[in-house]
């Protein structure tokens, strides 16, 4: 891209979570929330780390990107590096759901899913330094989800 364009920006958000439209595919937070709410067991991997991004943080970052117009690759991710099992425990805690339903497994439990490296986190230095957006911790993002749920109830 840099060979054909004089100026470019690639915006790379990582795995996002937050309330989504009912007609769309669930994200990790909504999927875990729904399963635990129904009292169903959830198997979550503990051997792949990512830094999940609250969807409102993504919007905030995109807005800053449009205003400041940096060039190059901008990663957009959350503050905390967690695996899906740890993320599930956060969901259970914040929403007051039964964490004992969450089962720790490794990626080999899901052979149909593409192999991933153990660390899939994205670096957020440019997000912080050039856009002025601070990555949101998982607990804070989930509490914002819970507050939004109460606001619409």
Q: Which residue ranges define each predicted feature?
A:
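Short aromatic/basic micro-patch
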Residues: 10, 52, 81, 104, ...
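NAD(P)-dependent short-chain dehydrogenase/reductase
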Residues: 1-50, 57
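A general structural signal for well-ordered alpha-helical segments in protein cores
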Residues: 25-32, 55, 59, 84-88, ...
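Amphipathic terminal alpha-helices
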Residues: 138-153
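Substrate-binding strand-loop-helix patch
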Residues: 20-22, 48-56, 76-94, 144
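Mid/C-terminal beta-alpha module of Rossmann-like enzyme folds, strongest
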Residues: 61, 68-114, 118, 153
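A hydrophobic C-terminal alpha-helical subdomain
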Residues: 108-130, 135
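Amphipathic alpha-helical segments that line or abut small-molecule/effector binding pockets
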Residues: 56-64, 139, 143
């Amino acid at each position: 891209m840099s060979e054909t364009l004089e100026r470019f920006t690639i915006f790379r958000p990582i795995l996002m979570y937050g309330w989504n439209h009912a007609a769309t595919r669930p994200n990790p937070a909504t999927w875990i929330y729904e399963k635990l709410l129904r009292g169903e067991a959830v198997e979550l991997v503990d051997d792949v780390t990512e830094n999940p991004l609250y969807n409102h943080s993504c919007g905030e970052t995109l807005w800053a990107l449009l205003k400041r117009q940096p060039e190059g690759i901008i990663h957009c991710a959350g503050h905390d590096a967690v695996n899906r099992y740890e993320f599930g425990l956060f969901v259970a805690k914040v929403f007051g759901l039964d964490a004992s339903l969450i089962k720790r497994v490794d990626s080999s439990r899901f052979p149909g899913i593409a192999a991933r490296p153990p660390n899939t986190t994205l670096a957020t230095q440019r997000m912080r330094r050039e856009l002025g957006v601070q990555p949101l911790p998982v607990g804070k993002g989930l509490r914002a989800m819970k507050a939004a749920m109460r606001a619409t109830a």
